[in-house]
Amino acid sequence: MRKIGFLLFLNLCFLVPLVASAQGPAPKVPVSGHVIDASSEEVLPFVNVTLLSVKDSTLIDGTVTDEKGNFTIKGVKANGSFIMRLSFIGYKDVYKDIKLKGKPLNVGTLAMNTNAEVLSGVEIVAERQMMEYKLDKRVINVEKNLVSAGGDASDVLENVPSVSVDEDGAVSLRGNSNVKVLIDGKPSELLGNDLATVLSQIPASTIANIEVITNPSAKYDPEGMSGIINIKLKEKGNKGLSGNINLTGGSAIEKFFPRTNGSAGISYSTKKWGFSASVDGRFNERGRRSDNMKLLFNQARDGYDAWMRSQQTGNSTNLSGGGKIGFDWYINDKTSLTLSYNGRVHGHPTDGAIIANENLLDQRFGTDTSLYSARSLDQITTGNSNGNFNTFSLNFTKQFDNPEQELMIDANWNIGKHYRESSQILDYWNPTMPNYEKRDVSESDNKRAVVNINYSHPFSKTLKMEVGYNLNYSNRYSIYDYYLNGSDVRNDDMSYEFYNTEYINAVYATVGYSYGKLSGQLGLRGEITNLNGRKEMLFKENDSINKQYISPFPTVHLSYQITDMQSAQLSYSRRINRPNMWTMMPNVDLSNPEHIRFGNPNIDPEYTDAVELGYSIILPKTTIFTSAYYRQTNNRISWFNFLWTEENARKYGFDWVLDIAGDEVDKGKLAQTSLNIEKSVNYGLELIIDQQITKWWKVNISANLFGNYTDATIINNKEIKSFNWDAKLNSTMNLPGEWTIQTSAMYFAASKTIQGERAARFFSDIAIKKNINKKITLSLRYADIFRTAGHNSTTITDDYISFRRGRPYRQSLTLNFSYRFGDGKPMKKAPKKHLDNGAGGEAGGGESEE
């Protein structure tokens, strides 16, 4: 299949001129058929199918096969003899004599054999496209993205059009951070509770492609307001023995922070059995630094304004490793059973320092250090965390006589443990202020089950139904212990135990149909969510919360094939963002002497209605994809920061917090919680262009122009409107001698937030690759060429203004070595082995690409 994919682009380039020059009589009857690879029996999309004159071999008409290998030529006179030619770069041409007798003709299934001479003697420059456009998603082929070589999953996502990753590892899609991330079609939570940590543990070398699904069908988990990002890992490929080894070493340039990782995989397959195993490990250090300035108005300091500056430095180490092993049993040509295990361990030591200096603006204290503000201090933090996650999976796939009729069962069980310890020392400049030391220790046990059952049934060639069930269960038990001022005795006023259970049961049905050039899918998903949480503390009343949501999620997908090279899509879906237990728990966290954090038990889920209109066209050297989208979110959940005063607590409806933290009012502390605002609207236009400038030079340009409207009257009596944009450029040059040079540039324009704004960002990378004997690849990557990466933001409230400037040590140099071995032949296609569901599937009743 990989060889097939490599050759798609050049075939498209050659076909369009042929079809454009076709001349012949008016259409009379259609000629149709199906094309496959002779050895693997994989379908062959985008094969050139042409009809030639028997007399002089002139071109009569032509088309290309679709993604399922099917084709139909409509412009053929009803009677006569013709020669049908199938052509596809890397394959031997196939010729077939056909004779029409006034009726439509189906030539059946035609098989094409690879041409070893062609593959060895011709340099395939374009190979597989970096980005492929399918019915309801975009697929980014990671192996074509050199500037992420040697990095991790976050580096890969940074280079995906319309996707961004901030300095804390938060992922956004089209400017919205509420996105669902899947790993091999399964929730990323199966590998860890923190997404940023999970992404940092996945080497880029283990990723096959990234699927971006902006408006998923009812088959998918509706979590993720802006859509779904599915990270698909590499799997075994050929029959026989094959494998690969990847090694990476490098460092940040400004300061030595080593960045190393390695991975290895091996697979062996026969007609009846398959085995695969892989391991990977990482040792990375990252530095961080930020400068924060805050102006507190006179409400905060006895009638005096105050100016505070804090400078933060630190570094963290990511030491992680994992392994995966899988066994396949091909019971027969239509049935398979797969068992697999995926385990990961990680360690994450951190340390940092903060220097915070607060001055009263009237300088009434002069040089008397005894009168320094209580907020001027030196802060030292250290920490360490480690954990393990183990996932056991079973997949059963059964195809019937009609390959479109299929039953799939996918079950996953995950158990994990996590330990975290951190300490914080506050050394106040004011000698009359006692120093403060806090150490907290947390341990958690996690259990999670994900079960997906899907059955697809074709009623005819144009009508197909899919039904399914999805269970998502999680259970977590955590202990949080706090120790103050060097004491080894636990502080029972702050320590607690936390129990959390979540059940999500879902059923769904989709009906896909096609009529001529029009195809579509209607879907409906119903979910019942039950959340239960309980916090227990000694000598205090327990806090608990129980929530249930029953929600319908309709979806509509329409596609119209304007011509063989042009298509349009229209889709609608309803999405949900469920507040997590920490967001809702009526818990007040007083462990930080500078901040107060508490949950909001009155928070409700937010729902989004999303509409999208897309258009794509394939030209000889250009592919253009554009999409206009509109999303309206009701009951939007937003983080909210304010100065902790009694007046503000009552103003925003948090009177109950005063019973717990009433003694902390009017001390200049900041409070943070979440709440529902009325609504927000996000709309935009996305444009992606793949341009083959020359035979050896290709450019991908993407831009996203989007506007935001937020009704934030409940927070600051304002309606916030903004228009933002971002753009990415990727240039790939395939040079003689198996050399490749790739550069990328990314720009994110300034944008407004509910309580402030984020500054513009820009950075650029470059990479050079050398292929040796088609088995060894060397890649050198230089990240952040101009040292411009950074994150600057401003927060504005009625009580203070803060400015934050963060600069990561992103500029780095890394060298990657990759070795592939094995002489296996392509395998015969087996039934699919996983559900793209957190679960999920494709619109229009289509199947996922393996």
Task: Say what each PLM segment does.
Residues 222-229, 237-291, 317-321:
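Outer-membrane beta-barrel translocator/receptor signature
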Residues 439-440, 448-452, 492-496, 501, ...:
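Outer membrane beta-barrel strand-and-loop segments of large Gram-negative receptors
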Residues 322-346, 376-536, 561, 565, ...:
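Face-selective signature of the C-terminal outer-membrane beta-barrel domain
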Residues 74, 159, 187-214:
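Short acidic/polar hinge/loop motifs at secondary-structure boundaries
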Residues 417, 530-532, 564-610, 630-665, ...:
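Surface-exposed extracellular loop regions of Gram-negative outer-membrane beta-barrel proteins
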Residues 36-39, 48-52, 85-91, 101-146, ...:
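Short, acidic, small-residue-rich periplasmic hinge/interaction motif at the N-terminus
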Residues 54-70:
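Short, acidic Ser/Thr/Gly-rich low-complexity loop/linker segments typical of extracellular
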Residues 106-111, 153-156, 195-198, 212, ...:
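N-terminal periplasmic accessory domains that precede
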